């Protein structure tokens, strides 16, 4: 009866339940911003907050009253005993689940409860039911459904009365609470009043007790835990919560699904669909699985089967060679797979298979040409070296064993290996089926030549032995032994030989021509036409052929005429080789194909032929090795940029630049061109001193005689360096006879006014004098004296080179190299000013040497700018000299820029396609 009355009273006065909270209610009213209103589900945990000491008394009283109210309510319903146990356990939950429950002891709770419940105890209330604090029986028991509904209804009431709550104040609420308690039940006994008060507090206490604050905070914590980390902390909360109270499975799965979707979006992954997932798929998710590696496999299995994966694996990384390493790299493309893919991985594979290296082919066309030329040249060089070694050895043995016969008609060349012969106007032997007819002494084995076998016998038999024309006097080239048997069998489909090969064969054969064969009918009127038509010969060719004919007919002529004729014939050999090919009936040679054959074979074989020709010194002319032959240059690694700004500068003959001697295509150091070899051979004659004496005897005069003209007048020449300078000037003739016309010629050729060999001539006098003194005083200090002599020699060499450079700068500054009119005017006045100009020049050189020696003794820490400024102030520099060095500098800069551009392009291509091109890019250029 009392319980029903209290329920009705609480419904009529909704503000009554709000004001019972004491200090908790005060905080709820004045500090509402610290208690954000949140809707809390009923299945969440409840725990005590970390309250202050001031809250302990009121809250403990409320919880104690709540226990008695629950017991009285559950007596009037069915199963009174079980409801009492569950009410005690639910009230115990508010104490045991709080993190701050350790601060309360059982003694404090019992004393607080006894203070508020003394009226009930005096009226006969049995306090035996209260001490249930010691043994909490909360294990896996479920919360009663009616208490859960009671908590939910109290929360809904709180939201309706929130505006009224803000206007209430603490003193009024306290007084209203006391008056309302007195007027509510004047006729009720103390037992019913205590039971009703407990029921009211039990009904609305979750809003003001520890449970309210605890549920709000725990709800906030549980909602924010998925955002704090990506590990399985949220799962631990769920497992702890499920162990306390069974929650609906739909809520858990929905919460997991939303959490995984949020995590997937944050990580940039695709969102998992909201379809019901199985246990196997849930294990593969990122939230619940410890390792996320199986996600790719699940996606691949979802789109296609395992068999389709195996089919697509070979096309994932297509093997493709670099476009510059192959001739038609753009044509070799990987076939596009026909199977359509549904995933991103299949699309990536499809695009990788369609990839082409077109951009690099456009940007690196110059690099492609260079690399192809390098590769082709390397193959040709290695092939020619092997062929030339075998050929040189065979030719050398042939010349030593037996001379080569006079003439052999080689109309068709389809042999395993052929001989190198010269055609003469004589009856030539003809090849038969059984052997060789003609000269009885001719035999391939006796001559130590390879066995000759006619490839086309019908054409060979058609060649009738007749008197050849004067064209047949020139050397006829043939195949070398170095060619393989397989290539010789295909002569009908490939060109026979290039111009360079013919030039080599003619060059080698000339020293080995047999001169013991008697000449026969060499006149033009006694010779018939050749077997095949030949082109007309011009006047120069006829004179050349007649000169060669007379030389071969009379071998006792002077060797100078013969060597001159041989040299001229070799110079024209490349021009006449096309005419010689017309004499062959079955040759079918095209000039275009011959020009595309080996480029460097001719030059390499010429070098080897010079070695073999050294064994026949009687027939070799002295000027044979110094001739200039027009031959193609070999392409090497070092090349200028494709488009140079100095292309016109190379064609200028009067350029004073030292780059004038450098050809467009760079060559190796050991392989010099004919122009450079010819220039270097004549260097000894051109690089003379200005007034170089005809004999060295005039230089071996005493030192006193050389310096007598200057030692008497000037005492400064007593210095050793000045004395040596005067010796250099007198020995070179600059002080005696200054001829500026010769200076202009000399500086233009050698860039130095004094021949460097003059130093060694002067040192002969020094060493002769020193050797006489060493012989007299040879003994204990002989080794030390040699060391001193070496030091002095090095010092004199340094002075000599310095004087030479100073003179070169001085003469170039006066304009003697570019203004011949000035040189002539100076040369006409040299008789009047010879002595004065000589003394002035000598004094200038001595002062310059002294200044340089003083600068060498300066402090090393001195600023470089001060030294340069001092040099500029002391003597004016000829800035026009730098113009001669400009082409070389520009070429070097162009080459460096070209290398850097190629390196950057290749590196960027490797970075753009790391999977297409495996391995590290090798360094292309070594600076």
Swiss-Prot record:
Comp. bias (Basic and acidic residues): 146-165, 210-226, 569-584, 605-616
GO biological process, one term: unidimensional cell growth
The organism's place on the tree of life at top rank: Eukaryota
Polar residues composition bias: residue spans: 115-125, 182-193, 483-500, 538-553
Gene deletion effect: No visible phenotype under normal growth conditions, but the lng1 and lng2 double mutant shows reduced length of cotyledons, rosette leaves, siliques and flowers.
Stretch list, region Disordered: 41-198, 210-257, 460-588, 605-626
Localization, UniProt: Nucleus
Entry keywords, A to Z: Nucleus
Primary site of residence: nucleus
InterPro entries attached to this UniProt entry: DUF4378 (IPR025486), LNG1/2 (IPR033334)
Tissue and organ expression note: Expressed in roots, petioles, leaf blades and floral organs.
Subunit structure, interactors included: Interacts (via C-terminus) with TON1A and TON1B.
Role summary: In association with LNG2, regulates leaf morphology by promoting longitudinal polar cell elongation independently of ROT3.
Note from the entry: The gain-of-function mutant lng1-1D (T-DNA tagging) shows increased elongation of aerial lateral organs, partly due to elongated cells in leaves, petals and siliques.
Protein name: Protein LONGIFOLIA 1
The species this protein was found in: Arabidopsis thaliana
Taxonomic lineage from the root: Eukaryota, Viridiplantae, Streptophyta, Embryophyta, Tracheophyta
